Amino acid sequence: MLPLRVAYFVHDVTDPAVARRVRMLKAGGAEVSVLGFRRGDMALADIGGVSAVDLGRTYDARLAQRACKVIQRRSSLGEGQLVVRDADILLARSLEMLAIASAAKRNYAPKAALVYECLDVHRLMLSNSIPGRILRFLERSLMRKARLLIVSSPAFISQYFAPKQGVGTSWDQPVTIVENKMLQLDVADPNEGMRASDLAPGPPWRIGWFGMIRCRRSLDMLCRLAARVPGLIEVVIRGRPARVEFENFDAQVASAPGISFGGAYRPAELGALYGGVHFNWAIDYFEEGANSALLLPNRLYEGGPSGAVPIALARTETGRWLKRHGIGALFDSPADELRSFLEHLTPSAYRGLRQAIQAQPRGLFIADREDCETLVRALAIAGHEQSGARRNAQFAGIHTARSVNRV
């Protein structure tokens, strides 16, 4: 049987999560090509071990510039059209890439199945403003051509796609939830052996804030706590700061006692990073009440194998996920509650929090080869239905939007 050929349209090829998804698709048996924009200066020729077609540079927080790029690429994909013509699946990561992929389907690959992968719901999409209504109309129009919707959190369906975009009713195509789990294809992973138990359970409590750093309110809160109670916490920040969201990120970190920023990191360092902290900061007020309340972030899964205890808001989907599994430290108002919690936290109580995480099944945090095959099978069904063929018994495990499939 020929492998499923997937053309993957991405909004930022430099995002490590893109490389992880590419590896997942390859491990599931698909043949993958990547077409995408980049946030950095340098074009990347290789993403997750496959070739990449550079569509140009775009910028964070510059929606008008990105919209112009999308319009340009809807008209012409350049060398990307060679990749698209042979594809069975056009997989679009984000709304802007769905706009490009739908045009590519019309222009170059009318028989390919269009699949929409939505991993964030921008605050405008939830707004009743005129721009918000226009964007939702655009998304609905583009989704009519899609044969599968992939999301990373069930709240994206229950709080947005079902009530606002008709998923499960007027749009009744399959939905698959692919959580942002770590990907482990090998039997042994050296990172998995790193445990937070290597740290003495007591102050200074070391909090790790890793990944996309974009929450100004979190930084302010942690800096205030570190200054008011010297020796209570140390905060280790690593990753990619969205500097446009901060007044002066570097100066604020440099002036705060007990706060350090160590720059970007490689995925191979995750085990050591999370194994070197007591707590995993999973609070994000960026787009509060909107995307940050609905998503299940990468760091939720990345810290699990190392036993780092997540700190999260109880009212968010992250908090509900942690509560369902009986793990983590949940707060209604961390600005008021975190200090008292840490000051009264005993070594034995902390060990109990950590042991609850380490008692969880491996599959709660880590995706394996079987998960990869399940994802590619869902894509294959989308392609199968696009061709007009009937769904048969071998695809019985994939459900419609009314009964969401999980990977």
Residue ranges and their predicted role:
Residues 210, 234-247, 263:
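Glycosyltransferase donor-sugar binding loop
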